[in-house]
A protein has these predicted regions:
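N-terminal/domain-start alpha-helical segments
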Residues: 1-115
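ABC transporter nucleotide-binding domain catalytic core, centered on the Walker B motif
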Residues: 19, 126, 133, 140, ...
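Residues at or immediately flanking beta-strands
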Residues: 22, 70, 120-122, 185, ...
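Active-site phosphate/pyrophosphate-handling residues
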Residues: 57, 84-85, 152, 169, ...
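DNA-recognition element of transcription regulators
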Residues: 100-113, 145-155, 167, 180-198, ...
Length: 218
């Protein structure tokens, strides 16, 4: 993450930590260049207006050096011409400030899926295959389509089988801070997924007073 706004950077880092991601934070281009030169990253989130330079120059050098790490630009510029320039310089996507964290996470997932390819991003548990790019669950040749939040919830469980997730944790992962939702919303989505997993080798188990976890059926 290349961002000089400490409050925003802290919020982004904390949000991605909930997803199990490790985030290095650079406040300027010099630190960002040092990080990129010594470490391989899955994704770069890049602010444009930085105290020691223009993020677009960093992006141009990044691509000139044949570095294929995907870059999502965080920008306050909303003009179409600005966005076209960013894409032409090699940005994989952009998010306009102020942004919704749920949208930022969704764009990151989409870019990473394109980068890795559909086959590499499929997850399998107990004979059930999750294809995030197609938004489907497949078991015994039976394909179930997933809506956006259903997909996000399945990804959380499939990425960490047997791990217990509280309702509050799942609410933080599925909904933005601006959305007024209750724990009942999580119960509704878990109920939908249980129906789609019925008859497969996987199930979402309720752990009393703690939350939910993905387990293999006995």
């Amino acid at each position: 993450l290349v961002e000089d706004n400490d409050q925003l950077a802290r919020a982004v880092c904390e949000r991605f930590a909930l997803d199990g991601h490790a985030v290095d934070h650079a406040t300027g281009l010099n630190d960002a260049s040092a990080f990129v030169d010594t470490t391989y990253y899955d994704l770069i989130l890049l602010d444009i207006m930085l105290p020691d330079g223009d993020g677009r120059d960093f992006l141009a050098r990044h691509r000139l050096a044949k570095n294929k790490t995907p870059v999502i630009v965080l920008t306050a510029r909303s003009q179409v011409s600005d966005r076209i320039t960013l894409l032409d310089l090699g940005a994989d996507d952009y998010v306009t400030k102020p942004f919704d964290f749920a949208e930022l996470e969704a764009r990151c997932r989409a870019v990473l899926r394109r980068q890795g390819g559909a086959a590499q991003n499929r997850l399998e548990f107990a004979g059930v295959i999750l294809d995030p790019q197609e938004a489907t669950l497949t078991a015994n040749d039976n394909i179930q389509n997933l809506r956006n939040r259903e997909l996000r919830l399945v990804e959380i469980f499939f990425a960490a089988p047997a791990q217990i997730f509280s309702k509050n944790h799942l609410m933080d992962r599925l909904f933005s801070l601006s959305e007024d939702v209750s724990e009942n919303a999580i119960e509704v989505y878990v109920g939908r997924l249980r129906k789609k997993l019925a008859g497969t080798g996987a199930e979402i188990e309720t752990v009393r007073s703690l939350g939910y976890r993905l387990v293999a059926r006995p």
